[in-house]
Amino acid sequence: MYYGHEPHDWGTSSSTSDMKECTICEAPSNGYHFNAASCSACAAFFRRTVTLNRNFVCTHQNTCRVNYAMRVICRACRYHKCINMGMERSAVQPRRDCNAGRRKIMYNSTNSLKTQEHTFAPPTPTVPQTTTVIVTKDERIYEDSSPEIHYAQSYSSSISEEISSLSPKISVSMCSGTDITLNFEAEQVLEDLLREERLFNERRKLLYCSNSCISELLTNENANEIPYSQSNLQPLTFAGIQKHIRPQILVIYEWLRGWRHFELLNIKDKSVFLRRCVLYHTILDPSYLSYRLGLPEKFVMFNGMYVGVQDGDKTGWEDEKDCITADLKIKLYRPLMDRLINEVCVSMKVINLTFVEFVLLKALVCFKSSTTCEVSVPLKKFMNTYMDTILRALNVHYQTLGMTKEDIAQRIGNVILMMSSIFAVGMECLESHQKIQFFDLWQLDDLLIKLIQRGGGGANY
């Protein structure tokens, strides 16, 4: 567990070690999967393709570009590149036969009707010998989606109450085939979240790295982990924060739109979800950047600006004429920064939080915080099911790393334990900024005020 009180070494950690490049999609990778240097996303794609025995046909003469930053990747070209780069179908474990899934559950005729009212019997999984899918660049098909996902795609202006039947579907796994299907869905969720985080980082890099040359902006080095390098960091000015708040809200909104069910939500649910994402991105992104780049000397904000952490270091805490005084800066934000460092950044360092863990932690926090607010009941149920899938994705990720069940349980527990501290800091952040707005202590962005003045106080964590 991470709640010890021993001194913390903020030197280079394993999470910052050199990363090899995935030979398929060019994303950073630190290992081999199926005998080829690849990232976990390409490994998951190859495993699904082989296990389900799928064939893809490219409509563009197999010349499509395959890159991790693309929203839609041609699956035919991606599979061919996996083979060309050395991945072996024989290295994938064959799909286990699921006899239990084919057995019918027998009930007494007198009780069958009552049983059917309360018991969900999962359909027998049927897998054709070969499935051919025509793939174009302009379409995005989730062939491995579960019944929950198919239902969500038919979600209109409000979710039907039928979604209440989704919750039991995860818990009634009756055969290994069902487990395999759920694992495929979890891998797809992980792939989606990793892709959106990479795009999120690339957008921030283009928006905020004003001193970088074009070649530096376009490089893919470490792009899926942190958007900045030490040379990009600049002393913080509150005027700069004012200028960059709205672009940051925009890139958070784009991250949110990457969730494939977001456009199916009604306006009220979208609004609540956006508020929670803005709040917790504002907490988690600086914490992770500081853990990776800044501490123990610097606390790095979302835009690459930093303030001094050590006593006596006035960097970023100076007076700013016509904006905010040094005393007000320290009074309003120094306690919040200290709490973030001690309760979030230190925890990240102690457990040596990896990029994949950070991505899934951020998704869990955003979804969980939304379910504690006034979202519709059907959406709340669906989000709870989706969080189960995120946790399953984390478990599958650990399994691909060869971790034991005991290590996996401890690791997941450490990640989940971080959430309570993050929620507590979130509530303090809301209260602090509501006071700033109420007493007009300094000028906040109007859109930010609208996002934090509602939906923040009624959450119970």
UniProtKB/Swiss-Prot annotation:
One of its GO terms (molecular function) is steroid hormone binding. It comes from Caenorhabditis elegans. It is found in: Nucleus. Residues 19-94 bind DNA. SUPFAM superfamilies: Glucocorticoid receptor-like (DNA-binding domain) (SSF57716), Nuclear receptor ligand-binding domain (SSF48508). A zinc finger (NR C4-type) spans 22-42, 58-77. The keyword Signal does not apply. This is Nuclear hormone receptor family member nhr-121. Orphan nuclear receptor. Belongs to the nuclear hormone receptor family. Its main location: nucleus. Coiled coil: none annotated. Residues 185-455 form the NR LBD domain. PANTHER family: NUCLEAR HORMONE RECEPTOR FAMILY MEMBER NHR-20, NUCLEAR HORMONE RECEPTOR FAMILY-RELATED. One of its GO terms (cellular component) is nucleus. Keywords: DNA-binding, Metal-binding, Nucleus, Receptor, Transcription, Transcription regulation, Zinc, Zinc-finger.
